């Protein structure tokens, strides 16, 4: 036994630390009205305690799940700490899911309370009769801002916390007690819950705060475009508090003008989000001759970042792209592609290519790739197989499931097909369900998409495998055009020196838009169903 002091790792201690050390550091958010509202860690801490004590007075017990359908705002920050700090579980609900899935999640989590934005009141009005566990709905507004609603047992957030105690002391909780709950997007079957503990969350926060995690600086100003319902906002609400970093929360303002306004007014230095958001922002900036002068880096996750986007960020805005990888089951940060001094010395083209990789595992995370027989494959950058992961913030068992989701040695199957090179860089080749099996060989839809998206007339690209009478499957390229040009031959010619000859798509189909799922990813399952017979008609 060591002689070190025992210290239980609780979420409440994190906001207490921020209140004590960084009370004046700002948390800026955009209200539904469009107004920019300024809070800080000191105010968030006090109001989180008011919320925590109010939940305790209401009768919420330790370990009970408290639901939220909330935007990125200061009140959501208060919920992150008030709910988890008092011993309940912060259950963030993806409001972009199908209503039936939202009802399923609320019932599965047995939420007694639901906190929601006023704009989501109609959604919950339609669902409330199918959500028998919910006792009260708390609208994230003041009494004066309360809309007319058919919700039963409804109260404003400000009324709910007004009698709370801002000097409330967080209870001492077991570090393995649950603090957060997120559900997978459920593209196949019902969503599955992933339950995070205080310990796993704080370990993830420490790792994310490291130089090889997110590479943050205490003077950074972070634009948090990633939704706070998505894997606990990628851990940024916690990382911000641990490091005293200014957070800029955009609310519903995700369009180009709204984001540019926040970036310029709040001197944003780092921006976090998915590729679809940045595609819109880059196009807006280009059309309006805007340069994002304050931003030095953007961390992009959710889906693979194309070479063309990395190049555009650098050439047009002098912004470095850090690609990160993770999933709901990994809390989420598992790998990051942080720019190194060696990368800075490379020719730009070579550096951009390296930046398309998902990066190296951060401390605490172990990766390996295996074949269909479970044999570990070499890390030579050529072999690719199932990506397996384990670590202290990796899911072991889904919420309310009877059996573990890991093998006997603790390895979790991510569902991704990947390669790992000799330097430790991991590359997602494809999702196992999306990889195209043509004549017994695999074709990466991700690599094909990234290549196609570099064409100047291509705004978005998606590759799917469709049935073929001879080869089982062949790739078809779906393109959202960037302009009026719809020239298949031009795109085919562009791809010739970028992909293997047998990877060439059998056809190119121009479409108006790609179907986007609740987490910002393209719904390939819908496209495969729509075009499944395209090559055998």
Show the residue positions of the predicted features.
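Conserved beta-loop-beta connector loops within the AMP-binding
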Residues: 361-388, 422-423, 484-488, 523
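AMP-binding/adenylate-forming catalytic core of the ANL superfamily
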Residues: 97, 103, 114-116, 271, ...
